[in-house]
């Protein structure tokens, strides 16, 4: 589930596939976990 979420964010941001934690750091997903 977390991996799928990371992939979803990757598709939206056009960034390489990062691990879930890295994705959160790179992308402010609007869920309060973004940097």
UniProtKB/Swiss-Prot annotation:
A GO molecular-function descriptor: toxin activity
Superkingdom, taxonomy of origin: Eukaryota
EC number: 3.1.1.4
GO cellular component terms, A-Z: extracellular region
Cofactor(s) required, per the database record: Ca(2+)
Family membership: Belongs to the phospholipase A2 family. Group II subfamily.
Protein name, per record: Phospholipase A2 bitanarin
Organism of derivation: Bitis arietans
């Amino acid at each position: 589930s977390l991996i799928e979420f990371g992939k979803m964010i990757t598709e939206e941001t056009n960034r390489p596939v990062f691990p879930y934690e890295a994705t959160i750091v790179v992308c402010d997903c609007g869920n309060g976990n973004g940097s």
